Amino acid sequence: LAIGFIIHIIWASVLTLQNQKARPVKYALRNQSQNATWASRNMYILGAMVLIFLVIHLYNFWWNIKFPSLGTPLSAITVGGVEMEDTYTLVSSLFESSIVYCLIYILGAVLVGLHITHGFWSAFQTIGFSNDIWRKRLECLAYFFAIVFAVGFSIIPLYFIAGLGN
């Protein structure tokens, strides 16, 4: 997965540089037409913001779970006779301690959703589904998938903001 992200970032950087070299002089008036969504026009910046969110997310969760001696040590709980790390306490302590972190996490989920929206249908366009019939269907599917993703990941901090964590 990590290698896939690295390749994705490198390829996105190469494509962005190629696009900039193809048109070294910027347009005098930027066309805000329906041919290009906000996400597609700002994909590289959106990707950078998603990367920042991903680093924050991995540091706060993955790092603390995989390397508890270097971060916040996790307590152990027993579920069904199996001892495991108490990751619920880690998640709840982060979201209950700061409304700012909750808002950053919700914003991050929305940014990932926007990034996915363009990337989803664009990937299918790359492999040949670029006619008018398929493009509209894939755009709808991309929006649906992005909304499910953003709402799904936003539910966790919203759950704690609403005070339902205890």
Predicted regions and their residues:
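Membrane-embedded alpha-helical bundles that constitute the cytochrome b-like, heme-associated redox core
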Residues: 1-166
